[in-house]
């Protein structure tokens, strides 16, 4: 009996030891790729959960904050050795390298270094894949990436094993390669890996050398990792037909300038012209788009027909080409109205709708969806059709806290869709669209925006706010509503709100008087 108990205790001890070792390995992973500070051995459960959520977001996984099976499997996959979170990103919250990490020249040279001790990757393989990657990247911007025989080319690619001198970053068994930002430009390929000479990785264990080289060249050009699995800058070499996404192209052009192309210019002009026509002829919208007045900074206390969204514990208010931030209790104006491009670089305007989806902000402009984390776009813009909505634009979007976690709904006309949380909000639920009259028959006609306050949906029509009461069996308008939007603005002087509220009351009084006169006569 004693022997049996002794054996059980030994097994339990080994299992606990194995579990601790696994956790240590996963902590080292998070430290290696920038999610945790190296050397921090006293981690709180909250900081570890936050690090896991950030890692999961960059890996395209559900952000559980837990070391679940899918997360562990992703950590075990071959990947690039470059950190996912740079030091400058920790301080600035940016997802891409800042502009100083780029080449200033229009002609960027590269060289292929003799492999030396390599037994798997030949110099010809490196030259061929570098030429292919350089040609592809060069097509995206006003820059030429060319092989050169000069003594010190700007980029240098070589292959090596665990300790590859003079690099101080050691390869491990799961690292395919790593590279360094300008003006270092070094690209190192792990010679221990058996690479396939294909254009993309077709299956696990057959990593494409070209895919890896194209990715590492992106780092050598100044770009960080992207959470978009379709992007060339996705950190994990997953079997897929990767491509240069719209965000990859946008970043390349923003760093190195766009190529002058008559065809592209004509196409862009045609798109702009069509967009102008679309916006001018939309008569079924619930709000009027301003044109000449867009350049005038709006009065935050007298705004009309804005788009309001709750994001990161505060409210964003969009109006034409402007945006400002308000505290979650509506009492403080955090920043006054600034151009949208100043707060969200690259975001077009005016916007149609906005909603928080997980940790991201989704902004709808025409048929495009811009996904923002912090104040920067995290991947290429989506189209409405990408998530299963075949419309040219949407009217409004909101989070509904009737569910836990909150559900995300998108409206257009008399139909609405729900994002499918099982698909990580990448598609709408296949049971939709549905008619708004099914559950929302009491919503007033002509609403143009929606936001969440005190976990209840608030709908905007003009300057009127309708609070929907989800605690009742029938979703109707809460008692005491509608109210003027300005009644929420605790940051405005009292006389500003009085003027606006009295204007609304005055209009209601006139309307009531006319109604009474009609009934009398």
From Swiss-Prot:
Q: Where is this motif: Cysteine switch?
A: 78-85
| Residues annotated as the enzyme's active site | 216
Q: Which UniProt keywords apply?
A: Cell membrane, Cleavage on pair of basic residues, Glycoprotein, Hydrolase, Membrane, Metal-binding, Metalloprotease, Protease, Repeat, Signal, Transmembrane, Transmembrane helix, Zinc, Zymogen
Q: Its topology with respect to the membrane?
A: Single-pass type I membrane protein
Q: What outcome is recorded for mutants in which this gene has been deleted?
A: No defect in anchor cell invasion. In 7 percent of cdh-3 and zmp-1 double mutants and in 25 percent of cdh-3, him-4 and zmp-1 triple mutants, anchor cell invasion is delayed.
Organism superkingdom: Eukaryota
Regions of biased composition (Basic and acidic residues) lie at 261-298
Query: Where mainly found?
Result: membrane
Q: Which residues form the signal peptide?
A: 1-21
Entry's Gene Ontology BP terms: basement membrane disassembly; proteolysis
Which residues are propeptide?
22-95
Q: Where do the Hemopexin repeats start and stop?
A: 300-347, 391-443, 444-492
Q: Which Pfam families match?
A: Peptidase_M10, PG_binding_1
Q: Where is this region: Disordered?
A: 259-298
Annotated TM spans: 501-521
Q: Does the keyword Zinc-finger apply?
A: no
GO molecular function terms here?
metalloendopeptidase activity; metallopeptidase activity; zinc ion binding
Taken from the UniProt entry, a GO cellular component term is: cell surface
Which cellular compartments is it found in? Answer: Cell membrane; Basolateral cell membrane
Query: What cofactors does the UniProt entry give for this protein?
Result: Zn(2+)
Broad enzyme group: hydrolase
Cite the domain annotation text: The conserved cysteine present in the cysteine-switch motif binds the catalytic zinc ion, thus inhibiting the enzyme. The dissociation of the cysteine from the zinc ion upon the activation-peptide release activates the enzyme.
The family line of this record is: Belongs to the peptidase M10A family.
What this protein is called in its record is Matrix metalloproteinase-A
Give the species this sequence originates from: Caenorhabditis elegans
